[in-house]
Amino acid sequence: QARPRPGPKIPP
C-alpha cells in the first residue's frame, strides 16, 4: 500500500 507523504495537514 502506498502511504501518503508525512507532513502537517493544513487546510487551504
Swiss-Prot record:
GO terms for cellular component: extracellular region. The keyword Secreted applies. The modification Pyrrolidone carboxylic acid is found at Q1. It is found in: Secreted. Expressed by the venom gland. Coiled coil: none annotated. GO terms for biological process: regulation of blood pressure. Keywords: Hypotensive agent, Metalloenzyme inhibitor, Metalloprotease inhibitor, Protease inhibitor, Pyrrolidone carboxylic acid, Secreted, Toxin. It comes from the Eukaryota. GO terms for molecular function: peptidase inhibitor activity; toxin activity. Belongs to the bradykinin-potentiating peptide family. This peptide both inhibits the activity of the angiotensin-converting enzyme (ACE) and enhances the action of bradykinin by inhibiting the peptidases that inactivate it. It acts as an indirect hypotensive agent. This is Bradykinin-potentiating peptide 12e. The lineage of its organism: Eukaryota, Metazoa, Chordata, Craniata, Vertebrata.
